[in-house]
Amino acid sequence: MNHLPIAPILLPLIAGSVLLLSTRWPATARHAFSLAAIVAQLAVALTLFAAVADGPILVYALGGWAPPFGIVLVVDRLAAALLVLTAIVACASLLYAVARDTGTSAPRFHALFQFQLLGIQGAFLTGDLFNLFVFFEVLLIASYALLLHGLAADRVRAALHVVVLNLIGSALFLLGVALIYGV
């Protein structure tokens, strides 16, 4: 079985976990590791794009469990194209963030950035609505943490507004998913 469809989720998960434990690394090492992880994600995305370019759809059942009990990842041309686009934008964003880094940034930025990529790429690959909700929540939690990165008073105030609006949106999303599954 080809395990490549899970790689866009595993790479940022592993990179983010390593970066969480790397608080004593020099900033340049964290920058380089995070950038290497994104370049690896771009390589995987391009490989997946090439694999589905002729039309086949890759389906990956985690743990061998079939739906509706298992988590299913689906890679089609749209998902693969969005993975490539995400990796390119992430690479450009990280290069910009590294260039603007004055050495005073908190060491958790790169880990949170990787976890945000985990949520985005998982949302593109998921094959059902409930797991789409789960990946959206992973994405939102990482974005809340990035927004609060630094704990300035204006950031906390802005984060409170974002969290309240996103909680309302998440509740409506979950209600919609429950209604769809209930039908």
Identify the residue ranges that each predicted region occupies.
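Transmembrane helix-loop-helix hairpins at membrane boundaries of multipass inner-membrane proteins
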Residues: 2-6, 17-111
